Amino acid sequence: MCIRDRAGWTPQLFFDHNGKFEDYLDSLRKYAGLKPPLAPHTGLKPIYDGFDGSPIYSTLDVLHSWKNALPSEPTRTITLFNLIALHDGNRTPGSGKSLDFKPRAERLLRDLNTFMNELEASGRPVLLLIVPEHGAAVRGDRIQMARLREIPSPHITHVPVFAKFFGLSTKSPEIVIDTPTSHLAVGELIARTITSGAYTHAKPLDLTALTSNLPQTWSVSENSNASVVQYKDNFWVKLQQSKWMPYKQ
């Protein structure tokens, strides 16, 4: 039994899509053990069509559907949102016209900001984590042009992670973690939060203690085309059967 189950937390799944492309939902069930049903999209209006033609719903509407589904009695839930409004290939519904990245990014940020303001006003104790899958390659470099992701370069694989506590008093100001971290640090932060008693005891949350000595991870990125690693202050790339060479950004 995982720490989530031992602590009495109920898992939930909310997507802005149907989860069928490349069997994403089934993969979560098979490899991550996430068994709850996917929250329905009843009453939600599509704002984009995905590259496979399936509907993509408003980020804010999906977040509101989570909030509206919360039981009136306090309960512990841990929710995975998977939001693909920024995926390449998204199009205007019914027209097939491609959409620029910037207005979609601005809309997503507005939706997230609105949702965070609503969380703040609600007083509900929440830890919100925003973890991008990868960068959009808006800018190119000396090896790979903009929008291409054939090589998992640092511009694509090094993404910021955002964590914010709502409804809890904290003893520390905003903290920036600039050490090399990965999903291991995110998982450790969640585990520490659950076991800290912050949600069951009326005591200030010590962010410094919560984030100190999080696991560090060397930068290693790989796909079917290439591998990219960081050694000291430089990045190196290996293309399939070729030798390692400097990745010149």
Predicted segment positions?
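Extended C-terminal regions of large enzymes
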Residues: 1-3, 129
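Active-site-proximal alpha/beta segments of enzymes that process anionic O-linked groups
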Residues: 3-91, 183, 188-194, 199-208
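Membrane-interface soluble catalytic domains
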Residues: 7, 19-23, 117-123, 138, ...
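Short, solvent-exposed loop/turn segments at secondary-structure junctions
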Residues: 17-21, 83-88, 133-137, 144, ...
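A long, amphipathic alpha-helix that forms part
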Residues: 56-74, 89-131, 185-187
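Polyampholytic, low-complexity intrinsically disordered segments
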Residues: 85, 103-106, 226-228, 234
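Short acidic, glycine/proline-rich loop/turn micro-motifs
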Residues: 90-98, 141-144, 172-175
